[in-house]
From Swiss-Prot:
Gene: rplQ
Pfam family, one: Ribosomal_L17
Protein name (database record): Large ribosomal subunit protein bL17
Domain of life: Bacteria
Keyword 4Fe-4S found: no
Annotated organism of origin: Leptospira biflexa serovar Patoc (strain Patoc 1 / ATCC 23582 / Paris)
Family from the record: Belongs to the bacterial ribosomal protein bL17 family.
GO CC annotation terms, alphabetical: cytosolic large ribosomal subunit
Source taxonomy: Bacteria, Pseudomonadati, Spirochaetota, Spirochaetia, Leptospirales
PANTHER family referenced in this protein's UniProt entry, alphabetically: LARGE RIBOSOMAL SUBUNIT PROTEIN BL17M, RIBOSOMAL PROTEIN L17
Location of region: Disordered: 140-172
């Protein structure tokens, strides 16, 4: 008799599946967009949504009714939970500082799956999993260009090269 499965198997062992989903979520949080098969993206999406919701618990609005000691304990607990599930301090920091604030007003639905054409080799349904409200490529290019303009040193005034040659000739 066919029984319902609570976990999508994805044709992998439990350890392999856990590592794959963890890596997909880390890549999603780092690059804010990943491409894979739709079946994998659906599993990664549910995991990513839970992780972002957990990060939102550290916001001051969610901890307002706690005293200082309990607030610090809750922040520490949530941070350690995220680190134990993601294993990357850079991603946990980005999650707590940037993404939690970005989605503070949103109640769920932090990601979306955009379906692409099927993969030609095996006809697997492909898709893109991306964070909602992320910056577009044009905005990122404009920001990068603005940063480059700020970092460029002001051009120095060029002195005529003849003056150097005349000084060298005068000293001989």
């Amino acid at each position: 008799m066919n029984k319902r499965n609570k976990v999508k198997q994805l044709n992998r062992s439990a350890d392999h599946r856990k590592a794959m989903i963890q890596n997909m979520v880390i890549s999603l949080l780092r690059h804010e967009r990943i491409e894979s098969s739709v079946a994998k993206l659906k599993v990664a999406r549910s995991y990513a949504e839970r992780i972002i919701t957990r990060a939102k618990r550290n916001l001051d609005a969610n901890l307002a009714n706690l005293d200082e000691q309990k607030k610090n304990a809750a922040i520490l607990h949530n941070t350690r939970y995220l680190y134990s599930h993601l294993g990357d301090q850079e991603i946990v920091t980005k999650l707590l500082k940037d993404l939690a604030n970005r989605y503070a007003e949103r109640v769920g639905g932090y990601t979306r799956i955009i379906r692409l054409v099927n993969r030609p080799s095996d006809n697997t349904a492909m898709g893109i999993l991306e964070l909602v409200d992320r910056k577009t490529q044009d905005e990122l290019k404009a920001e990068a260009k603005a940063k480059r303009e700020e970092k460029k040193p002001a051009k120095k005034e060029e002195k005529p090269k003849k003056a150097k040659k005349e000084k060298a000739a005068a000293s001989n």
